[in-house]
Regions:
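RNA-interacting cores
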Residues: 1-191
Length: 191
């Protein structure tokens, strides 16, 4: 399930650092029921030593935007669009209720009015599925060099490990939801 937000900054323009994911993540946590936000942030869905939040969000989209290299900021003209998705409908329900109640939010010290909040219902696929990512997918592995120092290797989509690691990550997340690998559907030839 997904929520699509249409935001209108009071000034008509939202200025935000180029690396703004933490700002959106904080906005999402602040917009949830406090107990749910605390549980999600501190606990989440567990798989071995990992904790998954099981929500995602797109980049901010705007028809007109500019980048100021000297300050490292993006200027996004109204309207601005954001999609937030989650497997867990409770997260999106809590988010939607609070956003409708408040009617506006502050992003990077700019007040933004919610012009619309739309719920996109979950589509249950039948057969093969082509997925289009609306934000970049980063796949990496931490390795150790001959000197013993940790190094992060980022895979490209053209490397075999890229899709294998994505699939393994999805499988871990599914197990964190269902609690047991035996409850998952058969995954033969899934990629």
């Amino acid at each position: 399930m997904r929520i699509s937000l249409k935001l209108e900054p009071q000034s008509g323009i939202l200025k935000i650092p180029i690396h703004y994911n933490h700002i959106l993540q904080a906005f999402i946590y602040r917009s949830l029921d406090r107990a749910l936000a605390d549980w999600l942030h501190e606990e989440g869905y567990r798989y071995e030593k990992r904790r998954f939040k099981l929500f995602t969000f797109s980049r901010l989209r705007s028809k007109r935007r500019s980048f100021d290299r000297s300050s490292g900021t993006l200027s996004l003209e109204s309207p601005i669009f954001l999609k937030i998705g989650s497997y867990e409908t409770q997260i999106l329900e809590s988010l939607a209720i609070h956003l409708v109640k408040w009617g506006e939010a502050r992003l990077n010290r700019t007040v933004c009015r919610f012009a619309s909040i739309e719920v996109e219902m979950r589509v249950i696929p039948k057969g093969p599925l082509l997925v289009r990512a609306i934000s970049p997918i980063t796949v990496y592995r931490t390795l150790y060099g001959t000197d013993g120092k940790r190094k992060t290797y980022y895979f490209t989509p053209w490397e075999k490990e890229f899709q294998e690691l994505i699939f393994d990550n999805l499988k871990r997340k599914a197990i964190s939801i269902y609690g047991d690998e035996n409850k998952l559907p058969p995954l033969d030839n899934a990629y």
